[in-house]
Amino acid sequence: MSDLGQARRSTLLDAAWRTAYRVGFPLARIWWRLRHQQHEGALVAVYVGQALLLVRSSYRIEWNFPGGTVRQGETPEEAARRELAEEIGLAGAFPLVAVGDAWGLWDGRRDKVHFFELRLDRLPELQLDNREIIAARLISPSELQGMALTGPVAVYLGRTIPPGCHSE
């Protein structure tokens, strides 16, 4: 399991953004719990052969798929494509396949997550933003065991579904 190359060197501004994410994320989780916040997101499982691409955010320890919030007026697929471009620099007319949805209570909010799959013969050079996304790795199925993963990724992979969560 090795880190995939980053596109550019980290700057002082990048470090400030990472600090803002690390401070802001726990505060946002408290806010979501207090407001009983609902959220809709889209995540993309990127496969290169049997390996799966996972990304690490600057503000959490778990690994995740590229993806994020579905904005108002945006379809889940549009959100998935936008997030791929923003987080890892992957843009283009590649075939995203919708593979299902999951609902759960993650990070203190009720979350509906739309899952997509993208299958590639080879991984193009990734352009990590060095602010929100700080690492990306291709992981073999055997390496997934014991890794810290976000709740939605664990559900996608068929791990034990926590109480209050379900998938379709």
Show where each model-derived region lies.
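A short coil-to-beta-strand element that immediately follows conserved catalytic motifs
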Residues: 91-101
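Conserved Nudix-box catalytic region and its N-terminal flanking loop in Nudix hydrolases
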Residues: 42, 47-86
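Short loop segments at secondary-structure junctions
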Residues: 49-51, 119-124, 141-143
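Nudix hydrolase/Nudix homology domain
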Residues: 4, 61-62, 130-168
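Active-site-adjacent beta-strand/loop module that shapes the phosphate/pyrophosphate-binding cleft
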Residues: 102-125, 137, 160
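Acidic, metal-coordinating catalytic segment for phosphate/diphosphate chemistry
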Residues: 2-43
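Short secondary-structure boundary/capping segments
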Residues: 36, 44-45, 106-107, 125-130
